[in-house]
Curated annotation (Swiss-Prot):
Keywords: Amidation, Carbohydrate metabolism, Cleavage on pair of basic residues, Disulfide bond, Gamma-carboxyglutamic acid, Glucose metabolism, Hormone, Hydroxylation, Secreted, Signal, Toxin
Location(s) in or outside the cell: Secreted
Protein name, UniProt field: Con-Ins T2
First and last residue of the signal peptide: 1-21
InterPro entries according to UniProt: Insulin-like, Insulin-like_sf, Insulin_CS
Naturally occurring in which organism (per UniProt): Conus tulipa
Propeptide positions: 22-29, 53-94
Amino acid sequence: MTTSFYFLLVALGLLLYVCQSSFGNQHTRNSDTPWNRCGSQITDSYRELCPHKRNDAGKKRGQASPLWQRGGSLSMLKARAKRNEAFHLQRAHRGVVEHCCKRACSNAEFMQFCG
């Protein structure tokens, strides 16, 4: 009786181990696995995957630009070029949303938007 009891315990232990290891891998994500990133997940991924880039746009809002403080020495073409740069930055942000939120993207694909 004791031998069959120990055999049953070992069998149950092995079964538990197999179940735990197979279900435990369901929730882990490989870095190359594409997944959808939306909202704050895009920001978190940007901070994690693009550490060499900083986005200071939010800090500069409300402050006068040093270029505008020069007393009108900029031509209209330079001012328009500056506006166009900001427009392209906004479009690049929409590109990351289009590519990684509405469709899934991997870390390697996301890093193409680091710039």
